[in-house]
């Protein structure tokens, strides 16, 4: 089919933040598709958890402990991937941590706000830009020379996918100001990279998940159970926490399609619509 790679088998990818949540679900899917993935996370994955599901998978995942905000981390990540698998075909930038404020913004220490902003920007847009470009410098010599087929489309391309957030599309909550600002900056970086790397036959896209059954949302609703109850009582959409694996089809699509770039796919079951309505009504 024009516009699609036939398979991820034999492809090599980099994924950050792959020991839990979205990242872990994506890694398992990629390996099941025959891809080899170098996974980088500040948290170590228990050996048993890594080996059990890999035994029957056609691909392979190698785990490395790495803080993506450390000096020289992006170059090191690419170098380790090349040493392990010999090439880079795609990158999934997924690592993240949301800083939430307990106080209202009018009462929040400005020093605390500034520190949170610095941390979130280092973790999201800065890490995205540096890792994407470090990987692109390796991918471009292989992918830029690929000629178009008789339909005018190139039969293969490099790919970068970034995990954004519904807060990047509709930043509404003051407790997530730093996180939302950093994710919005990621959106800008993603689009700039798409424009810059397109001529090199490297596509750059994003997914924007909503509240999922991961640690952050569970903690938020644990603090504010009435918000969840209020939203779920009046929504006609899909109120439940999304399973982390729900992002997998979108990620696989963005990694295998050879035409789409500069695009964000929202993945929140319509939940953000009701969340926006809730906060606007308060």
What positions do the PLM features span?
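Conserved glycine-rich cofactor-binding loop
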Residues: 12, 19-20
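Short, small/polar-rich loop/turn modules that mediate ligand/substrate recognition or access, typified
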Residues: 198, 203, 260-263
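A glycine/serine/threonine-rich, flexible loop-to-helix segment
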Residues: 50-52, 106-107, 199, 209-235, ...
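C-terminal substrate-recognition "lid" of short-chain dehydrogenase/reductases
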Residues: 240-267, 272, 278
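Catalytic loop of short-chain dehydrogenase/reductase
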Residues: 97, 110-116, 140-185, 190-199, ...
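Conserved glycine-rich Rossmann-like NAD(P)H-binding loop of the short-chain dehydrogenase/reductase
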Residues: 33-49
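Catalytic Tyr-x(3-8)-Lys segment
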Residues: 120-122, 224-246
């Amino acid at each position: 089919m024009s516009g699609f790679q036939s398979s991820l088998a034999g492809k090599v990818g980099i994924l950050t933040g792959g020991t839990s949540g979205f990242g872990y679900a994506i890694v398992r899917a990629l390996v099941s598709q025959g891809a080899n993935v170098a996974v980088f996370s500040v948290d170590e994955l228990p050996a048993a958890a890594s080996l059990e599901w890999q035994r029957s998978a056609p691909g392979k995942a190698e785990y490395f402990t790495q803080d993506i905000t450390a000096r020289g981390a992006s170059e090191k990540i690419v170098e380790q991937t090349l040493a392990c698998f010999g090439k880079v075909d795609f990158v999934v930038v997924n690592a993240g941590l949301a800083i939430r404020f307990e106080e209202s913004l009018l009462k929040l220490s400005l020093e605390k706000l500034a520190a949170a902003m610095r941390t979130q920007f280092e973790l999201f847009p800065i890490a995205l830009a540096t890792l994407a470009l470090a990987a692109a410098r390796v991918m471009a010599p292989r992918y830029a020379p690929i000629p178009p087929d008789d339909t005018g489309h190139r039969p293969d391309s490099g790919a970068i996918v970034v995990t954004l957030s519904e807060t990047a599309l509709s930043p509404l909550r003051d407790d997530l100001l730093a996180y939302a600002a950093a994710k919005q900056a990621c959106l800008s970086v993603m689009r700039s990279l798409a424009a810059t790397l397109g001529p090199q036959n490297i596509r750059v896209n994003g997914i924007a998940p909503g509240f999922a059954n991961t640690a952050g949302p569970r903690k938020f609703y644990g603090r504010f159970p009435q918000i969840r109850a209020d939203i779920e009582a009046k929504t006609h959409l899909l109120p439940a926490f999304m399973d982390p694996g729900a992002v997998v089809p979108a990620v696989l699509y963005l990694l295998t399609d050879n035409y789409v770039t500069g695009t964000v796919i929202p993945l929140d079951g319509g939940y953000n619509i009701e969340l926006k309505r809730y906060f606007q009504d308060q």
